[in-house]
């Protein structure tokens, strides 16, 4: 069975002891095209349980994996701006690999608050691999983008990197959160290029925030001893540091809430799931 690791962290994180009062409860926006960013939110909230969290997802333009870079940048700017007009944001986490690889410069130019992105954990994977074969499991867009290949060239020149892009895995993760079972034969078909290799990757980077939601099923399908690595814990530590270095943060006593771009039957079904993650309500964000 495969093993799930987190970037530069192989033990569970303990929550930072809380001395948070109403005066120090700043707002954190976690954004993704879908629900995959909940995997990042879980890690951040585990470390920083007493902040005010907003989760926003773009269920109108989902998925981002095969959208143009220009569209993604403009869309993310529009959504973050709409949230910022309604809430005093202390920090924004772009919990989407695709959006992170193209929109971070524009976001940091537009806004004064810190913006944290998610990038594939190529560097720790290259350090951990024993057989020198690292798999990057991501969307097709992330696999093809120049940024990803620059990461590989910078941190993994001594490794053989096997790239596997799949939008179907994103759909499977979304379906799982809606209560549907993940068919293992489908996973095996998607992963066939690796499973049929004489020496498959012994370390797999989960290069999409949806994919940690499928970790249990992936570990059943991948070869014994395969390590799975995601960036959630590293993002949580980065967020904690950035919050600790800011002064005069605006606090709120509002409940955690989620925003979508359109309300429909799917979002009605998703509301109990979001409530299970600590979000009291789900609202449409006018954009």
Swiss-Prot record:
Active site: 96 (proton donor/acceptor), 208 (proton donor/acceptor)
InterPro entries: Asp/Glu/hydantoin_racemase, Asp/Glu_race, Asp/Glu_racemase_AS_1, Asp/Glu_racemase_AS_2, Glu_race
GO biological process: cell wall organization; peptidoglycan biosynthetic process; regulation of cell shape
SUPFAM superfamilies to which the protein is assigned, alphabetical: Aspartate/glutamate racemase (SSF53681)
One function term, GO molecular function aspect: glutamate racemase activity
Record-listed substrate binding positions: 32-33, 64-65, 97-98, 209-210
Pathway of action: Cell wall biogenesis; peptidoglycan biosynthesis
Function: Provides the (R)-glutamate required for cell wall biosynthesis.
Protein name, as recorded: Glutamate racemase
Gene from which the chain derives: murI
